[in-house]
């Protein structure tokens, strides 16, 4: 059959099919904002996580039967609206930067629509596998390409849905994203095949079976959490305004405030006290007077103290680091960790010769930090006490933990590497004051929830302006700094018992193997489409 005649017949079939579609599918212009709206509402501060399970249905309906370029455009528009509603807080740092980030991130929605528009039209069960696999593959690429930005993943919308997210200890956050997208795909295919009850039964049955298995595993895991020794940790939330943070005129005030809050925290008799990222208002190890004051605070309370500070290494070319320093209970420095994963255009300018113009548009100077080189596991000793569940625990117990600075907790491979190096719990110190009183701190904490579940370790967060909290192995926020009902932009302390676990999960050992499988499926599907079109 000539190509022209075949195209005419295909167009006629699409028109006939459109007339028999449900009204919701025929009225496609309203579907794009509907998808974006549902997805935005599933994230903080709304936390209507159940909307994520239907959030992509309108988009899939909208791109069904569309040409590839049309599917790309509609999906890209959905992505623009979604990211405008989720990373809007970047406007507090830079408006041009926020627009650029939104336009870039939306590309992943566009590519998703471009690829799955043909899968969405299939009548075979392959669509139920391909659609979520393509989404997961794109999320993984987004989390790694150009240093990565794994923020607002589909899985993160489920951070408060504890039974569902337990599968992350095997498949990571990407496994949860796959499950949510699979349900979206099944609902879409059900709507599309509403007149064919055989397909209706198959798609929904398959999706519900996946959900049932995940829930069953989640309930089992929630009832069988790993036990271990207890450690009491205290976090300090200084609530230091950005306008004061690096002004030398306020240095004494800032150090004095942290000293008072640390003394307050010590009344809870913790084994470790934690300050936020860059809480020390200067170069701790290079300024003798400042070092003496902070060391004196640690010595006075008699408790190991972890502080965030900029560090500088003198040499032929001075190197600046974003660091975490651990003081022993005697005021002596035990170890230092230098941040491994820097924030591009925040802590450094990548390919500075090409992108030096970016600094002209930044509302504050862009840092020139260097990347750390070591996966540091902090170690300190504590005496055995009545809270130990281990009768064989010696009088001195070595406690091991690692620290993720700022956005490092959005990188699961980094957290898993620390746990593989025998960290018994993780700490995230951060300063989210840059983003104002927005949903950013809550979105940020969602990443820490998944790091806890993936590795079955407790995660302790100390944030300058919040959210400072404790997350257990189940991903539940068990305690937080809160004053007068507010957890953001207040100062305060919180102390809580955490569990030290030595368990290695499947995810800790094997990492993103599930995501790799999804990428293979997605790549095979794309290659199949290209080959098929080439032959035809």
PLM features: residue spans?
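Membrane-embedded alpha-helical bundles of multi-pass enzymes
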Residues: 2-221, 437, 451, 463-465, ...
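Soluble catalytic domains of enzymes that build or remodel membrane lipids, polysaccharides, and related
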Residues: 220-510
């Amino acid at each position: 059959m000539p190509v022209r005649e075949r195209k005419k017949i295909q167009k006629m079939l699409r028109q006939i099919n459109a007339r028999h579609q449900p009204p919701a599918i025929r009225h496609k212009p309203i579907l794009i904002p509907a998808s974006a709206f549902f997805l935005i509402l599933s994230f903080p501060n709304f936390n209507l996580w159940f909307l994520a399970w239907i959030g992509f249905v309108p988009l899939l309906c909208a791109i069904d039967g569309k040409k590839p370029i049309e599917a790309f455009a509609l999906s890209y528009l959905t992505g623009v609206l979604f990211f405008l509603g989720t990373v809007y807080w970047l406007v507090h740092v830079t408006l041009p930067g926020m627009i650029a980030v939104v336009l870039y991130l939306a590309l992943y929605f566009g590519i998703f629509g471009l690829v799955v528009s043909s899968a969405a039209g299939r009548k075979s069960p392959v669509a139920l596998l391909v659609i979520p696999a393509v989404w997961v593959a794109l999320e993984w690429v987004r989390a790694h390409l150009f240093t990565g930005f794994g923020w607002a993943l589909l899985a993160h919308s489920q951070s408060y849905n504890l039974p569902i997210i337990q599968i992350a200890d095997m498949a990571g956050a990407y496994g949860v994203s796959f499950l949510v997208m699979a349900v979206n795909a099944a609902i879409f295919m059900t709507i599309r095949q509403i007149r064919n009850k055989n397909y209706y039964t198959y798609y929904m049955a398959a999706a519900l079976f996946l959900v049932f298995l995940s829930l069953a595993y989640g309930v089992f895991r929630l009832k069988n959490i790993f036990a271990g020794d207890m450690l009491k940790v205290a976090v300090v939330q200084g609530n230091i305004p950005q306008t004061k943070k690096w002004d030398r005129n306020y240095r004494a005030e800032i150090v004095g405030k942290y000293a008072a809050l640390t003394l307050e925290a010590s009344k809870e008799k913790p084994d470790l006290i934690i300050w936020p990222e860059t809480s020390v208002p200067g170069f701790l190890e290079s300024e003798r007077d400042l070092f003496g004051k902070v060391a004196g605070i640690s010595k006075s309370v008699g408790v190991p103290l972890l502080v965030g500070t900029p560090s500088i290494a003198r040499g032929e070319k001075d190197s600046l680091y974003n660091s975490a320093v651990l003081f022993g209970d005697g005021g002596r420095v035990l170890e230092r960790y230098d941040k491994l994963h820097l924030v591009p255009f925040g802590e450094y300018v990548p390919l500075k010769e090409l992108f030096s113009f970016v600094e002209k548009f930044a509302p504050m100077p862009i840092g020139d930090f260097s990347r750390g080189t070591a996966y540091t596991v902090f170690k300190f000793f504590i005496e055995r006490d009545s809270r130990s569940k281990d009768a064989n625990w010696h009088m001195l117990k070595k406690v091991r933990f690692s620290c993720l600075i700022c956005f490092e907790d959005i990188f699961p491979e980094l957290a898993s590497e620390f746990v593989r190096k025998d960290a018994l719990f993780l700490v995230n110190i951060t300063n989210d004051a840059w983003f104002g009183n927005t949903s950013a701190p809550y979105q940020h904490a969602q990443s820490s929830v998944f790091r806890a579940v993936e590795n079955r370790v407790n995660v302790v967060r100390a944030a300058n302006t919040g959210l400072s909290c404790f997350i257990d192995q189940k991903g539940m926020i068990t305690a937080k700094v809160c004053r007068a009902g507010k957890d953001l932009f207040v100062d305060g302390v919180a102390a809580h018992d955490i569990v030290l676990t030595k368990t290695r999960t499947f995810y800790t050992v094997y990492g993103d193997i599930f995501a790799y499988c999804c990428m293979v499926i997605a790549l095979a599907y794309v290659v199949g489409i290209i080959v098929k079109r080439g032959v035809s």
